[in-house]
Amino acid sequence: MFKPQSIYYEKEIENYELGKELLEKYKDVPKVIIENHNNIEEMRKKENDEFPKMKQNLIIGIRKTHKFVENHKTSDFLVPYTSSGCTAMCLYCYLVCNYNKCAYLRLFVNREQMLEKIIKTAQKSEKNLTFEIGSNSDLILENTITNNLVW
């Protein structure tokens, strides 16, 4: 099971039930308050060889954009959902070279807002829609931390 070495979090997560739960769950893990989960300067400055160490961090924030991308290959929409990134260290991973800032697991605590947008989009449609929520994250890993799959 994943146990983070440090947690970087947006202060606003304290206003969400899941945010409170995660801070309590990891109360003994060192924490750093950040302005934005998407721009952690300390992480952006790290060299690629620090990739394995970066994987030991957990970032907790609020997903601010809920943009659905039309897909039409495996679903109607690709939906950024309750997490992004992972904790694995696959040798072929493109994140280390291209997105050092995203080499770690990010969890988003505003799951109610994200689910609400999916539901509203589906209700507006005249046909049944398929939303792919797992293409940019590891929902199984995430579930071991958040228990989000019940959602």
Predicted regions and their residues:
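Conserved Radical SAM active-site core
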Residues: 50-52, 60-72, 95-151
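Flexible, acidic/Gly-rich N-terminal and inter-domain linker regions that tether
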Residues: 1-76
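Short, flexible loop/turn elements at secondary-structure junctions
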Residues: 11-13, 82-84, 135-137
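Short gly/ser-rich anion-binding loops that grip negatively charged ligand groups
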Residues: 76-83, 104
